[in-house]
A protein has these predicted regions:
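A structured, charge-rich N-terminal accessory region that forms the first stable segment of a protein
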Residues: 1-72
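Active-site beta-strand-loop-beta-strand hairpin of nuclease catalytic cores
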Residues: 107-126
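Well-ordered, non-membrane alpha-helical segments in soluble/globular domains
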Residues: 44-45, 140-148, 185-192
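Compact mixed alphabeta submodule
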Residues: 138-139, 153
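Flexible, glycine/threonine-enriched loop-and-boundary segments that flank and lead into catalytic domains
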Residues: 99-105
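Acidic-basic catalytic patches of nuclease active cores, encompassing PD-(D/E)XK
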Residues: 67-98
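Metal-dependent nuclease catalytic regions and adjoining charged, substrate-binding loops involved
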Residues: 153-205
Length: 205
């Protein structure tokens, strides 16, 4: 069983043509390889923000910025400013541990893992952090919300599911989607399964 990241699956849903196949094949060859020498700055920042919000102990962000590669320091500072600007829109923000679950499909599974569990002004949110430099389209934002809704709503009916596009300063709270998007996600999951199955067969041929 191959393991595909939540964000990588969202990228796959929005791609077309050869880029779509390349995305699935990258998942095939990278699955299970936890040693990634090309860790991007936003992955470090994501983990630091989760730790800070969970503990309530805010780090010295200037020290954190200086620890990043020089070419990533400006982008890291910009993302931090935008994150805390967004958070300042709320009078209160309390942490809770957000739900997580594996979405098991035919040839792969996806770790559905909203990183931030925040009670914002009394409303419980499970939030997927998006700090990537790639544009977050409305389709990907809706798809993320629908996947989380499908996975968690029955057990956690009071939670609002959202994706925070830090760079664009947009907070996408899922408020429902058309039946067509549900069918689209089923089709995209089947499409990725078909590509991964073909890659597996070719690898053993």
């Amino acid at each position: 069983m191959k393991h595909v990241g939540f964000t990588k699956f969202l990228d796959f849903t929005a791609q077309t043509g050869s880029a779509k196949a390349a995305s699935a094949l990258a998942a095939f060859y990278q699955s299970g390889n936890m040693q990634n020498s090309r860790t991007h700055y936003y992955e470090n920042l994501r983990e630091a923000l989760i730790t800070a919000e969970r503990s309530g102990k805010y780090t010295d962000w200037e020290d954190f910025i200086r620890e990043q590669k020089e070419e990533a320091q400006e982008a890291t500072r910009d993302a931090l400013i935008k994150f805390y600007k967004w958070k300042s829109n709320y009078v209160s923000a309390a942490w809770y541990e957000p739900p997580k679950q594996i979405w098991a499909l035919q040839e792969f599974d996806v770790n559905i893992n909203p990183e931030l569990g925040l009670i914002l002004d009394g409303e419980v949110h499970a939030i997927k952090l998006y700090i990537n430099n790639k544009k977050l389209s409305d389709l990907k934002a809706q798809a993320a919300g629908l996947i989380m809704e499908n996975m968690f709503h029955e057990q956690y009916p009071s939670i609002k599911f959202a994706i925070l596009d830090v760079k664009a300063e947009k907070f996408h709270v899922f408020n429902g989607a058309s039946e067509r998007l549900d069918y689209l996600l089923i089709g995209e999951a089947a499409h990725m399964s078909a590509i991964l199955s073909a890659a597996k067969q070719r690898a053993v041929a």
